[in-house]
């Protein structure tokens, strides 16, 4: 049986790593912060060791350029700010991870989730299975018989989310997730949602009508129709995002260990050397 493709939301895991490890305890040889570099790489290694995928793709946001979502809705992710020491490491991480031969994707106009959607769609079309590692629940729309979401849990193995788990959590099908977000809203992305509609109400409406489009056709939310269509587009992953070919490839942990040692992350280097020896 063909091993799955592992597609990782780089920004999601880097944020978790940055806030999980103390900045003062992890410094690079040049004095800069190394906690996100160390924590992210450790998370990535554990994912690889636990799942043994055929290849790994790490997707990144482009923080220096707006996406079509920001252009379409000026309130999208409004007020979101990052600490300078996190931004510095987000800038370093793609090149650092690429030292192991891991494919990293990043392009103006796209979010990491868009690349995850494109990777999942392409792998499924080729008859493969996909593991999508992210804490962003927008990605629940990707859950299928072939695509499983790996949601990180601190101090434990990731929670596996398939179609049944999406139904259990939200009462909707994965394909309904963008409509669900449009109706309920998403505080993390500053998507307002429909007035007076919460999580349960959104699920009930989708159970009754099947889709936001059907609701609007039948006259529901007439005053908010255009706004809700916009919110749905914001929540829909762009599965046409450009990704390279992804041949089977095991990470070269030894090369990444050398890179970690070079920048002064000795503990991480030893961890990666052990992983290389066990390959």
What is the meaning of each model-derived region?
Residues 2-133, 137, 141-160, 229-244:
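Noncatalytic, basic helical substrate-engagement surface that gates or grips nucleic-acid strands
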Residues 2-3, 52-57, 125, 144-148, ...:
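Non-catalytic nucleic-acid-binding/docking modules located in mid-to-C-terminal regions
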């Amino acid at each position: 049986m063909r091993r799955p493709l592992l597609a990782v939301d780089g920004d999601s895991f880097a944020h978790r790593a940055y806030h999980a490890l103390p900045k003062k305890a992890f410094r690079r040889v040049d004095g800069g912060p190394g906690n996100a570099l160390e924590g992210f790489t450790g998370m990535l290694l554990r994912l690889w060791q636990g799942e043994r995928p055929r290849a790994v793709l790490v997707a990144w946001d482009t923080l220096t350029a707006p996406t079509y979502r920001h252009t379409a809705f000026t309130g999208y992710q409004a007020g979101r700010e990052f600490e300078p020491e996190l931004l510095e490491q987000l800038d370093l991480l793609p090149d650092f991870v690429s030292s192991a031969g891991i494919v990293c994707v990043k392009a103006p106009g796209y979010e990491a989730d868009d690349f995850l959607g494109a990777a999942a769609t392409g792998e499924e079309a080729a008859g493969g299975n996909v593991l999508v590692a992210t804490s962003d629940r927008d990605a629940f729309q990707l859950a299928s018989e072939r695509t499983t979401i790996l949601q990180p849990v601190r101090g434990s193995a990731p929670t596996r989310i398939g179609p049944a788990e999406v139904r259990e959590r939200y009462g909707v099908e994965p394909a309904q997730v963008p409509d669900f977000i449009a109706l309920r809203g998403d505080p993390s992305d500053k998507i307002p949602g429909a007035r007076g509609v919460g999580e349960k109400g959104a699920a009930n409406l989708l159970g009754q009508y099947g889709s936001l489009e059907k609701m609007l056709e039948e006259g529901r939310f007439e005053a908010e129709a255009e706004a809700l269509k916009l919110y749905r587009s914001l929540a829909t992953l762009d599965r046409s995002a450009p990704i390279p070919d992804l041949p089977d490839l095991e990470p070269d942990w030894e090369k990444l260990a050398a890179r970690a040692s070079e920048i002064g992350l000795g503990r991480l280097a030893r961890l990666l050397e052990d992983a290389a020896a066990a390959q």
